[in-house]
Structures are given as structure tokens and as C-alpha cells.
């Protein structure tokens, strides 16, 4: 089949929608730069605007909005000008990438276990972006069986990741307090409930009414995420050591060989990447075999074996200690490369 864009979008209808949405996205992100600067520095909007260059790099959260605005402008250029499907795929990847800067620079990067929360928040943001896009496609185009068949499983996986990531972030932020003991916790409970309803709806038969219900859940999730970013979780108010601030956990005692090779502190990000890498490869192989083509079992075994090594390294004590000693860090790094 042709990879020309005209085959699937001859009138550029989808491109115009994306172009308008990306422009709004970029403009709102630019507006957030002085607003976030003022909020972070305790200034008025006018004070932050007059001396904006000083505050753009004052905190990671302000710089994050600048990155989001730039990525929005990139999508605004790609959406109408791309002539091949590859350009649209690139715009999609940039859109997903733009979901990361804000979540990973918020309160989830503070305090004990923030390594778990940061990874979970980033994965939840990616899952939510993909799943929300699937919902939007169905609402705009209607419950077309051909479209539904292509995007339904993506929405389900994305919604599940959104829910799981949201639970981990809430657990870390509440720091052992009741989830209903403060405003941030209540907001996060609403988020978890909306995500749960979204997951359930994604598995039900498609209809226009259920499509709008799923879009309603997406709206609630996005609204609560935006509102909760302005609230302070209990974890944020707890003092932390330099080690916790940097690593997310206290420095463990001097290791032995057994400790380095035994199960340690897992890395959620690499675990997820490994599982998706294996699942995606097996899915691609199943498509190839469905077409009647052959695929070497040795290739499959090599691919899975490599990801199993990554899972092992991201789960043992060596990974935990590699964050604090350069020699062990390079050992993990070079093993990954090989």
C-alpha cells in the first residue's frame, strides 16, 4: 500500500483539526510560562512578565512549559505540511513526547519513593495521551467498526496504564496518610475513580453514547490532573535527606556480591519498556506469520533474551547501587548496550 498521505487524508481534514489544536496548545503553553513563573516565585503576573528571561529557567516546571510550547509548534507545522504518513506518525510521536515534561517536573519528583512516582507518572501521561486520542477519534468519526478495531486495544492498554500509574503516584504523594485527609488526596481519588470508569467503558461494546461517556471521563481526568498540580501533597511537606532528594531512597549499606546480584529496588520504567518490547515484537511476529511468512525462532529468542537481561538488571541490587557509584553505573550501562 502507498505511504502517501492522500490515500487516507485526501482533503487534509485531519490535518486541519490537528493544526488548530496544536496552535491552541502552543499558545496556552506559552501563556503558562509567565503564569508558572509568577506562581513558582511568588510574584504577580506583571512582575514575571516584565523580567521573563530571568524566570524561564528559574525552575524545571517553568522550563517544561517552554518545551511543551515548542513541541506544539512542531506539530502545528507537521500537521498541514506532511505529505507522507511518516510525517503524521512523527507528529503523533511529538504529541506523546509533549505529555512528559509537566508530570515529571511536578510534586511527584519530590520525597521518598519519587523514583517510583516519576516513572509511573510519566507512563500514565503517555498512556492517557494515547488512550484519549483513541476516544477523540471515535467521537469525531463515529463508531466506525474499521476504526474501532484499530484503536480499541490501544485505548484499553492506555487507560489501564493511566489507572495503574495514577494509583502509584497517589500512594507516593499521600505518604501513608488517608487518601481523603486532604484536598490533593481527594482530587486524586476522583482521578482514580474516573480512570476506573474509563477502563470499564473501554471494554464495553462501542456506541456513540458510550463514546461521549468515555470522552467525559477523559475530561474529568485532565481537569483533575490540572487542578491537583496546584495542590500540595502530604509527601511534599516531609523533610528529606540529600540521598532521598536525588535517588528517591536512602543510601543502603555497603553491598556484597550476593546483594548486588539478588533482587533489589526495581525500576518501573525499564520493566514497562521491557514488557512492551517483548509484547510488541510478538505481536509483529504474529502478523507476519498470519500473512504466511516465516520468522526465525532464533531471532525471537534473542530478542526476548535481551529484554529478560534488561528486566534482571533493572530488578537487582546492582541497579540500586549503580545510581550512587559510577563504576557500577557503567557496568549496567555497558551491559544494556551489549
Task: Set out the residue ranges of the language-model regions.
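Polytopic transmembrane helical bundles with strong interfacial aromatic enrichment
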Residues: 2-256
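Early transmembrane hairpin module of multi-pass membrane proteins
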Residues: 18, 27-40, 51-69, 246-338
Amino acid at each position: 500500500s502507498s505511504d502517501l498521505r492522500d490515500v487516507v487524508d485526501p482533503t487534509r481534514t485531519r490535518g486541519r483539526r490537528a493544526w488548530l489544536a496544536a496552535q491552541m496548545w502552543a499558545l496556552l503553553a506559552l501563556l503558562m510560562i509567565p503564569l508558572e513563573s509568577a506562581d513558582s516565585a511568588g510574584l504577580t503576573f506583571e512582575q514575571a512578565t516584565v523580567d521573563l528571561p530571568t524566570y524561564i529557567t528559574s525552575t524545571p516546571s517553568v522550563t517544561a512549559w517552554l518545551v511543551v510550547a515548542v513541541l506544539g509548534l512542531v506539530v502545528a507545522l507537521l500537521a498541514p505540511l506532511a505529505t507522507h504518513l511518516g510525517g503524521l506518525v512523527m507528529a503523533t510521536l511529538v504529541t506523546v513526547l509533549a505529555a512528559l515534561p509537566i508530570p515529571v517536573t511536578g510534586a511527584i519528583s519530590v520525597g521518598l519513593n519519587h523514583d517510583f512516582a516519576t516513572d509511573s507518572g510519566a507512563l500514565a501521561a503517555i498512556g492517557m495521551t494515547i488512550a484519549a486520542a483513541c476516544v477523540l477519534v471515535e467521537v469525531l468519526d463515529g463508531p466506525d467498526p474499521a476504526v474501532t478495531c484499530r484503536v480499541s486495544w490501544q485505548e484499553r492498554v492506555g487507560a489501564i496504564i493511566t489507572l495503574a500509574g495514577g494509583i502509584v503516584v497517589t500512594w507516593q504523594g499521600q505518604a501513608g496518610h488517608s487518601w481523603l485527609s486532604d484536598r490533593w488526596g481527594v482530587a486524586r481519588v476522583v482521578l482514580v475513580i474516573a480512570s476506573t470508569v474509563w477502563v470499564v467503558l473501554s471494554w464495553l461494546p462501542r456506541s456513540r453514547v458510550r463514546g461521549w461517556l468515555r470522552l467525559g471521563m477523559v475530561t474529568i481526568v485532565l481537569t483533575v490532573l490540572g487542578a491537583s498540580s496546584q495542590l500540595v501533597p502530604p509527601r511534599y511537606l516531609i523533610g528529606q535527606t540529600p540521598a532521598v532528594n536525588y535517588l528517591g531512597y536512602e543510601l543502603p549499606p555497603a553491598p556484597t556480591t550476593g546483594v548486588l546480584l539478588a533482587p533489589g529496588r526495581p525500576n518501573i520504567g525499564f520493566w514497562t519498556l521491557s514488557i512492551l518490547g517483548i509484547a510488541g515484537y510478538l505481536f509483529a511476529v504474529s502478523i507476519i506469520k498470519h500473512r504466511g511468512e516465516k520468522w526465525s525462532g532464533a531471532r525471537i529468542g534473542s530478542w526476548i533474551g535481551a529484554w529478560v537481561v534488561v528486566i534482571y538488571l533493572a530488578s537487582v541490587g546492582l541497579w540500586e547501587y549503580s545510581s550512587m557509584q559510577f563504576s557500577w553505573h557503567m557496568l549496567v550501562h555497558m551491559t544494556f548496550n551489549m
